[in-house]
Design a protein with these regions (language model features):
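Surface-exposed amphipathic alpha-helical tracts and adjacent flexible/coil segments at the periphery
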Residues: 1-181
Length: 181
């Protein structure tokens, strides 16, 4: 009951730090993430070393945030405005993402919690559009942890369209997982 409009970030690239608090880009790349110029050093490969082990990968690279499943809780908490990342993304990304968040906001506002269900096909569309090894619900319900990170790759993981095999003639054949086109 603040009388102030409340906005929350609901979809897109998560900052490793709490957004607006990261100094790593300034210190390493000379570009302030707090001024919209983040060099994304969290998306670089890093190596963790201790006396007993070493681990390499994209250890500081979070998966992208997807809050479609959380919309009822966010609306009930009094959130007025949903922020969707779109910087340096294709128009298709912004269009589909905004469409789906509008669709599910309207679904909840008209049908309530008992009729609220996010279709798997819609989540798959978002995954096909852009994801870093899956989505996370970020910091909404728990502290960050390994399940929040995309340590194998820092960028779009592409589309899994099927399985390939080499036939007897030495040609590549692809067995599609679903209809293409």
């Amino acid at each position: 009951q603040t009388g102030v409009e409340i906005e929350t970030f609901v979809h897109g690239a998560l900052c490793y730090c709490y957004s607006g608090q990261c100094l790593m880009s300034s210190m390493i790349g000379g570009r302030s993430g707090n001024r919209g110029r983040c060099a994304q050093p969290c998306r670089l490969p890093w190596t963790f070393r201790s006396d007993s082990r070493e681990k390499s990968g994209y250890l500081l690279s979070p998966k992208d945030l997807c809050s479609l499943q959380l919309l009822p809780d966010l609306i009930d908490a009094g959130v007025d405005s949903l922020k969707i990342e779109g910087r340096m993304k294709k128009p298709e990304y912004a269009a589909l993402t905004a469409y789906l968040y509008r669709k599910y906001t309207d679904l909840y506002l008209t049908g309530g919690r008992e009729h609220y269900h996010v279709d798997q096909a819609d989540l798959e569309q978002l995954m096909d559009l852009y994801n870093r090894g899956g989505f996370t619900d970020g910091y909404f319900y728990r502290h960050n942890g390994q399940e929040m990170m995309s340590v194998k790759r820092p960028n779009h993981s592409g589309l899994n369209i099927g399985q390939g095999r080499i036939n007897r003639r030495g040609e590549m054949e692809i067995q599609p997982m679903k209809a293409l086109g």
